[in-house]
């Protein structure tokens, strides 16, 4: 489906680890800046991939746009939030390939100016199965609760929206459970960077999911 909107898109699969997967995508790029589209992203019809950063276009009047990281908004299908979570991103190829460690959040911590785009790029359809849904909510709410990206009123409003139960969508209960667990983990480890970085270790998250859902007997609470 992505090829409908971006005929030259290249797929990366079978690479373990978020950083290595992103770097594999960078190596496939034939340009200095390249778009990243998550596998669960459903591109909206009004979005296109025609924005090209240049050395002469200045962001905030001072930074060449080709040196920045861009993030477009996405629609969350569970809580209807619209912001950068799960949105299409545009990275600098050379900078991404030079990174040796994935911090808690790559886009906002890779050493380039982070630019939010208000246009909606996609629906972030992460609620495809229990684990994927729980994992997505857990990771994002850990970031929001810890303040690792931004610690302000908007962040708290988003966290509150994630932590509301919506049983009228597929796997809404798992999103709710992941959000609450992520909030607790983020608050507990607010100043513990090694602990926060574990959210990018999917084997660790899988163990947490199994531990928590078993402990609370989640399956018996879902109709």
Stretch-by-stretch model annotation:
Residues 51-223:
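Catalytic-site signature of metal-activated, phosphate-bearing donor transferases
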């Amino acid at each position: 489906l992505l090829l409908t909107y971006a005929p030259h898109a290249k797929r990366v699969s079978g690479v373990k680890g978020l950083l290595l997967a992103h770097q594999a995508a960078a190596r496939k790029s034939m340009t200095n800046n390249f778009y990243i589209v998550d596998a669960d992203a459903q591109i909206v019809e009004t979005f296109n991939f025609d924005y090209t950063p240049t050395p002469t276009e200045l962001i905030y009047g001072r930074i060449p746009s080709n040196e920045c990281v861009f993030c477009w908004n996405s629609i969350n299908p569970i809580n209807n939030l619209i912001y950068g979570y799960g949105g299409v991103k545009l990275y600098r190829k050379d900078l991404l390939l030079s990174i040796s460690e994935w911090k808690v959040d790559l886009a906002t911590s890779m050493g380039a100016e982070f630019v939010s785009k208000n246009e909606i790029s996609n629906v972030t359809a992460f609620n495809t199965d229990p684990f994927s849904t729980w994992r997505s909510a857990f990771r994002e709410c850990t970031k929001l609760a810890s303040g690792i990206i931004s610690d302000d009123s908007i962040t708290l409003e988003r966290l509150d929206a994630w932590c509301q139960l919506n049983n009228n969508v597929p796997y809404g209960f798992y999103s709710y459970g992941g959000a609450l667990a992520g909030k607790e983990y983020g608050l507990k480890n607010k100043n513990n960077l090694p602990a926060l970085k574990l959210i990018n270790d999917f084997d660790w998250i899988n163990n947490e999911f199994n531990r928590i859902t078993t402990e609370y007997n989640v399956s018996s609470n879902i109709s």
